[in-house]
Amino acid sequence: MIQIKAVFNGNFDLLENIRVSPFSRAYTFSDSVYEVLPFFSKKLIALERHIERLQRSVDAINITLDIKKVTDEINQLLSASDFDNGYVYYQVTRGQDLIRSHMYSDKMDIETFGYITPCSFETKKLNVMICEDTRWGRCDIKSTSLLANVLNMNNAKSFACDEIIMHKDGILTEAGASNLFFIKNETVCTPSLSNNILPGITRSILINALSNKGIKVFEGDFNYLELKTATSAWLTS
């Protein structure tokens, strides 16, 4: 049996021993953000970029976070892990609220939770469904509020699709859990960053890598119908 290492509010234990209060605002309001950090051969990929994005997320929802402590906990999880390849999931919640209210207290104690799990990383062909982007207006924040993604992706699953590609009023945004790239007229294209798109770490790494090879990436607004004439398309996550 695989034993998953975890940390909750600074206390390290096995994942099966972690206990979270039902009064956590992560449960009642999805009042939380998260980050997913991949690692290969026990080495975290783009740690600083992931930490910077987590910092932007907590800043956006007015949570003060000891980012050095978070980084230390992530590294400790990796050091204690038996897995060579996988990812670290780390979540920050505003805290517990015994009286359910949309308005939160400034004196709440934040809750942090992380765990590490094995994962095989591979490139594979996908069947995708194109659908309307029905998510909220701040998808640039890596929020745990993912119900629209869940519903749309499970609808796609019922049609034997692996992923969704979303558009807002006809303009491409992103996939359910990844960023979109495609080639058209021998040009690499990807939707511009906006409130409707999460600034993917792999997205930025790929754009930089292509630029270093002299391959320009065109970022812009694209109608979803343009995918029909694309030479190829891929998702990054």
Residue ranges and their predicted role:
Residues 92-93, 169:
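Short, well-ordered beta-to-alpha junction loops that form the rim of enzyme active sites
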